[in-house]
């Protein structure tokens, strides 16, 4: 059967619908295309274009995590697209729609493709194919701080051809804003979960708009209607219908719940299921094809729903007796391949020569529409805007530099030229460098924030990777320069480093270059790491050897030959070496009385030898070069410039690594876990297809509470107003989002909240559900005739629009967790499990019940997440249920099933309020009441819908607005909601003002009277609750502990990396100081190894920040639902992390301790005590990381301040600067430092009564010592330190504190626990 002719102004008549669409007047907010004299659309395209696509035996597979294993995604597809035609893809999520589009867009990465895929008779030209294709992806990934207009303009600047004038670009942006009804939002930021921006539906239109900028011949749109109401979807598809008719553009569109009028706009239909094609052919022949197989479309049934459901539930449409002749994707696909329809399509593929008259040929064009210099400029401008918009992060970086500069400046204020301050200069230089290094950890979050957008734009060839890479570098320079200058000025001049302009400039340059270099290092790690959590683990582990082998903690002569290569490749070594040479070279040092050997301030110093020291002593270091010599550094002044060049070269190397990984690595999470697949297959064997009529809510125990309390919940609200604070013209004002809303819901009632995008539906739902965290609410809300109490969460549940779910749980575990924590504690576990199993079956989740939910693209699809989200809330068996867009992201079959379930829950006596965007006729019939809002949050209608929407439509008919009998009533009411409409009433012209007419209506008067009288009948029993939580504390502890433990063990990569990092660094540190003897040199090495071991615990702890941040969103949702107590949540989270903290500490400590030769007694007591202190220190640092993750809003800021805290802790612990050298004004900080006490304990544990000796090179000879005989002799050799107690005295550590300080360590654990609890209870970083 030949496809219909293309190029006509109208598409063929559909057998199941009405006359097809032709160019129409403007409807609602979106604009119809305007034409110039030549018939071309004004402001968008200037020439006709199109693309002829043919696919023969197209198949695709992708590798799994199991080596050598492949998973089929597409199987043997045959289809075509012609210029001017529109093809609709239907199929349940996971059917392969996205894979088809990626293949057509030539955006494949790890997939293996076979078969033939031709574009205008040729294979895809990899260089220019993207210039002819516009691909609207499923997800809405944008730079959150950019406004809608800026987002479109950026796309226009880079996707419109070189030479296009600014006027043309702006005209196209204006056109798209008007077309997508975003003109009013053009100056609103796009936003994300942390930054309030446009609504979900508006964000989807932004996603579409950035691709509409292109002069594309082929439009690919993957579920563009998600989050849009039905009217907006229809208008959008009409626009593309016009575009196809006039400009011969070929379109392939995947939709989930298309209405009849939307479906009629398409020429061809493609139905997919599980990667198989079960139909491709003319839309007009689709129904007759399936009727030929024995499946009939019921009367008044949406054909799109019929097409989507027929493979999964063939028994619903089979006319004959017995079992349907076909079941499953493969059987339907084989039937199609054996049909005359398929043969007709194959003949067209084989015999039809592509008519390229209307086809745009871009093969002669350059790969990118704009030159590289222009790409770099635009990408850099965007990066600078991103930087400026992140005001909190920028301020934190500057404040951090000022604070640290002042701390160091006052701590090391006015350094002298004695021995102690000579060492302090070295410590200051090393610490300053570490501060610069660790400040770069915030770059991990910066890159991950932009990475998904970069992937999309890289695939779309907006710019070369090099342009994006340079934008990251350029945008970092100003802020790095500013924070470096502030820090260096304070540190250098307050500390009294050499007052020399050249040396100061060098100090500034080295720190600045080092800052940029390590920013690039952290971004390089982020470019290849699969997620931010692993990046936060890998980066410190890779950095630790560089720090250890920098020459400060382990001088060059102490490093064994097997590790000396790390010393030579450590960038920190060269930076430290350059700064040390810059400061120490040329300085002359002296000794205070206490610093000479022997000290001049000893009582017998002036007595002749051997009764005293004969008034003679030696000052060991008198020149700065001797400090350099001790560390094995060059003693000439010019080599520091070589060091600077080497650090710059390392920065360039890290930058190249970042560029390489950005260019060549594209993290793709679609490769499934074989264990998940295996579990899912087992589950699918047990699954049974059930009709909705078989879902007995009472058997499912969804009316358990009703047996105890015969009613649901009465809720009423009056004069409800909601306002938010905004700034306009520099003044604080209040913007009203809801304006005097009235309404109610009662048991058995299913109330729909509807209105166009931006009308305030979700806002109203949040206010009613008590989920708003900001703004100002006025008016009255009563629950069962009383004000809302703290027990409100016991009787209510809220299905949020955004599906925030625990990523490591399986589907069944997530729903079961909700049931066990929210159902009554006296309900047996067996009944709870049965209850959950019925929910899983009803929501068609049985096949994936054992699959992990995952995060982002990793794990479940959008549709599956939505159903799991609904299941989690249904598991609480609520009396009052709020749902925000429960069908968004679902196909029509799944959406109808969900709404049937919700309707039955309402029928069982529950009260339900539900926002909904684009309900089909079948779905809209489920609602018995409607609250209709217009933009601005004003009521247009509140009342019953009536049988077949008779009451609702009757209200509008009374005002002269008649709904076409074949039109979906839901679409009709949205069409007439917003504007004043000119109509006729009783034969006279009439203006319909939606809000005013409702206020004056009898409906409104009756509603107000009912609310004033009270919705709840007098004498109705009210449920009483005796606790905030449904479950006992014991149940909460068990369930939270189980979930938290499984979350830990399922992060396999994280655990593996975490433990390998500990083992690696333990072996490295142990072999660096292998079998230390009790010599003078090894005194300092022992102190270094003990200090580094503790600080490694700090670095290890900070890597948990992304995990805590990821869990935080789930916690916010569950806490708002009243699932569990905060202390129990926190306690179980910490307890389940303890084994991994213990393993990390032990795996590090064992090789480090025994290989290095730290102190051992026959009973092993020093080792066990050291291990215990290491474990407690690691645990405290892990708790400190949780404090930062819960208190601070983003990963970037938490990492930045966590690095600062770690730096300050290491500074005041007593290693960098001995306690005696700490200024009195800062001594309290030394005493507050949580690292001070474990360091003191492990030092006492190691050095107490330990004997030391000197090698021949370490002993000191004192010349010209006066003896009792009156002669002068050389006395020596003298060993400066012979007992470890001398070291303890130098660091002001007392042996009796070895066990006393344990109480302080545990005190910090309690303190951090309290801080985390307070943060979880009172701080929310997600605003509503």
Swiss-Prot record:
One Gene Ontology cellular component annotation held by this UniProt entry: membrane
Every ABC transporter domain range: 53-299, 721-960
Residues annotated as binding ATP: 91-98, 755-762
Keyword Cell division: no
Spans traversing the lipid bilayer: 398-418, 428-448, 477-497, 504-524, 534-554, 559-579, 642-662, 1059-1076, 1087-1107, 1128-1148, 1172-1192, 1197-1217, 1303-1323
Localisation: Endosome membrane
Keyword vocabulary terms for this entry: ATP-binding, Endocytosis, Endosome, Membrane, Nucleotide-binding, Repeat, Transmembrane, Transmembrane helix, Transport
Pfam families found in the cross-reference section: ABC2_membrane (PF01061), ABC2_membrane_7 (PF19055), ABC_tran (PF00005)
Region (Disordered) location: 670-691
Disruption phenotype: Cells that have a abcG2-abcG18 disruption have an endocytosis rate roughly 70% that of wild-type (or rtoA disrupted cells). Disruption on abcG2-abcG18-rtoA cells have an endocytosis rate roughly 20% that of wild-type. The exocytosis rates of abcG2-abcG18 and abcG2-abcG18-rtoA disrupted cells are roughly that of wild-type; abcG2-abcG18 endosomes have an unusually high pH, whereas abcG2-abcG18-rtoA endosomes have an almost normal pH.
Record's bilayer topology term: Multi-pass membrane protein
MF term (GO), any: ATPase-coupled transmembrane transporter activity
Domain ABC transmembrane type-2: 388-665, 1049-1286
Keyword Repeat part of the UniProt annotation: yes
Function: Required for endocytosis and endosomal pH regulation.
Entry's family note: Belongs to the ABC transporter superfamily. ABCG family. PDR (TC 3.A.1.205) subfamily.
PANTHER family: ATP-BINDING CASSETTE TRANSPORTER
Protein name (database record): ABC transporter G family member 2
